Amino acid sequence: MQKLAVFLFAIAAVCIHCEAKYYSTRCDLVRELRKQGFPENQMGDWVCLVENESGRKTDKVGPVNKNGSKDYGLFQINDKYWCSNTRTPGKDCNVTCADLLLDDITKASTCAKKIFKRHNFRAWYGWRNHCDGKTLPDTSNC
């Protein structure tokens, strides 16, 4: 019985990442962001943000922040205000934090755009520290 429990735990641990995606190239990410309706004139900022926040991984969960919150997904969206850590969608983006970890980034994109509309890119420390006022990634060849 104990071996079965260990086996099932191992399968569950692997499957947590079954629906995750890693954008292996910058252009893969750019194509997906275009599909999600991100504006072309902001593409360099969004790519820089994603690369510095999550490393282009949809399943990234950040470490616990000083206030006890965590950041989730491709855009590292915070659970204090934006996503619910329960099975019921909630908070300002009306999503679960698990929704933000899927390879389908539709909900994460919608939430990121909502955050941007309220706070601009300054809502993300990865953007502030690595992108603001710096040379942005060139996405023109994608």
Curated annotation (Swiss-Prot):
Question: What the protein does?
Answer: Lysozymes have primarily a bacteriolytic function; those in tissues and body fluids are associated with the monocyte-macrophage system and enhance the activity of immunoagents.
Which SUPFAM superfamilies does this one have? Lysozyme-like (SSF53955)
Q: Record's InterPro entries?
A: Glyco_hydro_22 (IPR001916), Glyco_hydro_22_CS (IPR019799), Glyco_hydro_22_lys (IPR000974), Lysozyme-like_dom_sf (IPR023346)
Q: What is catalyzed by this enzyme?
A: Hydrolysis of (1->4)-beta-linkages between N-acetylmuramic acid and N-acetyl-D-glucosamine residues in a peptidoglycan and between N-acetyl-D-glucosamine residues in chitodextrins
Q: Which residues form the C-type lysozyme domain?
A: 21-142
> What are the UniProt keywords, alphabetically?
Antimicrobial, Bacteriolytic enzyme, Disulfide bond, Glycosidase, Hydrolase, Signal
- EC identifiers of the protein: 3.2.1.17
What domain of life? Eukaryota
Q: What is this protein called?
A: Lysozyme
Active-site residues? 53, 71
Q: Which family does it belong to?
A: Belongs to the glycosyl hydrolase 22 family.
**Cysteine pairings via disulfide bonds:** 27-142, 48-131, 83-97, 93-111
